[in-house]
Amino acid sequence: MAFPGSGRSIPGQLCAGVFSGLIQPPLGQKFYCPNGGGAVPSPLPQALSAPQCNGEGRDPEPDRPIGYGAFGVVWSVTDPRDGKRVALKKMPNVFQNLVSCKRVFRELKMLCFFKHDNVLSALDILQPPQIDCFEEIYVITELMQTDLHKVIVSPQPLSSDHIKVFLYQILRGLKYLHSAGILHRDIKPGNLLVNSNCVLKICDFGLARVEELDESQHMTQEVVTQYYRAPEILMGSRHYRSAIDIWSVGCIFAELLGRRILFQAQSPIQQLDLITDLLGTPPLTAMRSACEGARAHILRGPHKPPSLSVLYMLSGEATHEAVHLLCRMLLFDPLKRISAKDALAHPYLEEGRLRYHTCMCHCCYSVSSGRVYTADFEPTATNRFDDSYEKSLTSVWQVKELVHRFITDQHQGKRPPLCINPHSAAFKTFIRSTAWHSSKVSKKEER
């Protein structure tokens, strides 16, 4: 079952980079030409209409910038090899220090590792220049029309069918990531891309990393946008597991039901207070990994009983099955929180699974006698993502050489490589849009 849209594109929030210079393509190679550059259109809530099967939908609008973020701009561009429109993401200034080098290399390898319909992956990487001039990376991904944040804040009605099929796809993609040993660590509506047929893909792996199995190894707490941050991170836990992503999905589930952020606080402490207002004062066993200050903050306050019944007031779509699944996701104790695999087996998502695999997915297909379904509706990764190479990375130049070789190797035996074409008529518009945004980002970061 597809969810058709108007066929027009909606700007989506994607992470990319601010262009700091031009890359001259090597002689004899094809140009990758951003062509377009019109103003970004306003969000079109009609992109989600009443659920029905209608095939693939219309093509996007002409090429243009489709998203701005703290790291720059993403453009819709045309691949000259086949005429298809795709998204072009830039990772700028990636070799400034060893930490950023490792992060970008990890994200790049992940984008090339992913093979799942609900996880954004790299379709191609633009050919890099000679290593001495190599400072930025351009990644081509599938073009998506909007993100879940824009869907939620739009006036477009969201039916129970929409909510179920969105949640099903989020958990389907998350099950795949977790099976590969990957924690996303920034699941939020803006990082869930949606096309005009309501197909959803998890994106933005800048904070993603392999799950650390050794509990003695500390992990950063500077992860996850605050509204979607799990209580164990808010309470200073130095080690966490995939349950942090499930908490984020629970917050998004509630947001889909109520069309507003579930825990919207001004500070991490207030965020924790809002969580305990809903879930009640947690037992000591649920705070086993909390820092002393956070534990003391909870214990010196008045005892709070749970008030989970208010979840039924989110909307008319908050049925008993919906609230039951939501409560399994929003458990204070991460060890008791439901997994993506078990959540997918919940009765609430049965209809979402059926609708998705009826005519939205690529793993099932129709024949004259009916629908042929895949043997595995929610596949896992064939192997864990290997990050063991990171231990041997000791210098910026070493990483730069490895990244350059990695990108070059991606093109071996494949289609002709592409490069940025600075002579394109639209390139000046591209540069102006990124230069303007660069100044805005700089001012924002100073505040």
Swiss-Prot record:
Tissue occurrence: Expressed widely in the ectoderm during early gastrula stage when neural induction is taking place. Expressed in the head region of neurula stage embryos. At the end of neurulation, expression becomes localized to the nervous system, and is restricted to the central nervous system, eye and head neural crest cells by the early tadpole stages.
Regulation of activity: Activated by tyrosine and threonine phosphorylation.
GO cellular component: a single term: cytoplasm
Location within or outside the cell: Nucleus; Cytoplasm
GO annotation (BP), single: positive regulation of protein ubiquitination
GO terms for MF: ATP binding; DNA-binding transcription factor binding; magnesium ion binding; MAP kinase activity; protein serine kinase activity; protein serine/threonine kinase activity; ubiquitin protein ligase binding
Cofactor names: Mg(2+)
Function, in words: Negatively regulates Wnt/beta-catenin-signaling during development. Plays a role together with sox11 in neural induction during early embryogenesis. Involved in TGFbeta-mediated mesoderm induction in early embryos, acting downstream of map3k7/tak1 to phosphorylate stat3.1. Augments the rnf138/narf-directed ubiquitination and degradation of tcf/lef by enhancing the association of rnf138/narf and tcf/lef. Phosphorylates mef2a to play a role in anterior neural development, including eye formation.
Organismal lineage: Eukaryota, Metazoa, Chordata, Craniata, Vertebrata
InterPro entries xref list: Kinase-like_dom_sf, MAP_kinase, MAP_kinase_CS, Prot_kinase_dom, Protein_kinase_ATP_BS, Ser/Thr_kinase_AS
Top EC class, one word: transferase
Catalytic activity: L-seryl-[protein] + ATP = O-phospho-L-seryl-[protein] + ADP + H(+); L-threonyl-[protein] + ATP = O-phospho-L-threonyl-[protein] + ADP + H(+)
Active site: D186
Name listed for the protein in its UniProt record: Serine/threonine-protein kinase NLK2
SUBUNIT field: Interacts with sox11, hmgxb4/hmg2l1, rnf138/narf, stat3.1 and mef2a.
Transmembrane annotation, as ranges: none
EC number: 2.7.11.24
Species for this entry: Xenopus laevis
Family classification: Belongs to the protein kinase superfamily. CMGC Ser/Thr protein kinase family. MAP kinase subfamily.
Residues involved in ATP binding: I66, G67, Y68, G69, A70, F71, G72, V73, V74, K89
Top-level taxonomic group: Eukaryota
Domain Protein kinase: 60-349
Cysteines joined through disulfide linkages: none
Keywords: ATP-binding, Cytoplasm, Developmental protein, Kinase, Magnesium, Metal-binding, Nucleotide-binding, Nucleus, Phosphoprotein, Serine/threonine-protein kinase, Transcription, Transcription regulation, Transferase, Ubl conjugation pathway, Wnt signaling pathway
